[in-house]
């Protein structure tokens, strides 16, 4: 994947995104992906090599490392970023499907044929639901991975020394983690950015649902008032004083030219 493809992909997503979604994309690809590629992999590059225990028992450092780091931070973050960005691809695919269907429709019925969609640039119908579900899925993925990190690493902590008593270690041994402070800082940074992304996704969900409710139940969809229902002109025919039907406009002309006896009308 090159940067030109990534730019085209982001422009396709931004075409149908709100301001909150554009902020989310910036946070993901600047504060999460770039930090992960540039810095995080370098920090965790020596995680097992420099995991040292004060014992010479063969296999003890390996089992202790697996006990305290069952899954590497870097691999969990990579899986998290992949799952978080997949829903945006689904939105792009749905948009491409709509545009291709519209193109085939005009090729079959002519350029003057009515469009299948009212406005391709608006989120309506199935595209609205795809977009909304993608937001919920992204928030759920980030929340799920935050819970996994919390369960695997208590309070996202990175201690300097851990005590290990797993077999085949002969007794409780102390194991030392390399660069614990630096790893803790990056862990807190990734957790904070994930929490910000969850907040942005949920805010956009409430915004979209609230906007749709306003469109459905808003003032413009209420029934018109009785004053607006009344016609602007008189009915075409009214009864004259003699009981014969007479044009309403002629009655108005008579009313303007001579006084009309109000007592003759019921």
From Swiss-Prot:
Disulfide bonds join 53-175, 60-169, 64-164. Residues 2-13 dip into the membrane without crossing it. Residues 41-73, 152-184 are extracellular. It is a multi-pass membrane protein. PROSITE patterns: CONNEXINS_1, CONNEXINS_2. One of its GO terms (cellular component) is nucleolus. It is found in: Cell membrane; Cell junction, Gap junction. The keyword Repeat does not apply. Gene3D superfamilies: Gap junction channel protein cysteine-rich domain (1.20.1440.80). A hemichannel or connexon is composed of a hexamer of connexins. A functional gap junction is formed by the apposition of two hemichannels. Forms heteromeric channels with GJB2. Structural component of gap junctions. Gap junctions are dodecameric channels that connect the cytoplasm of adjoining cells. They are formed by the docking of two hexameric hemichannels, one from each cell membrane. Small molecules and ions diffuse from one cell to a neighboring cell via the central pore. It is linked to Erythrokeratodermia variabilis et progressiva 2: A form of erythrokeratodermia variabilis et progressiva, a genodermatosis characterized by the coexistence of two independent skin lesions: transient erythema and hyperkeratosis that is usually localized but occasionally occurs in its generalized form. Clinical presentation varies significantly within a family and from one family to another. Palmoplantar keratoderma is present in around 50% of cases. This is Gap junction beta-4 protein. The lineage of its organism: Eukaryota, Metazoa, Chordata, Craniata, Vertebrata. The gene is GJB4.
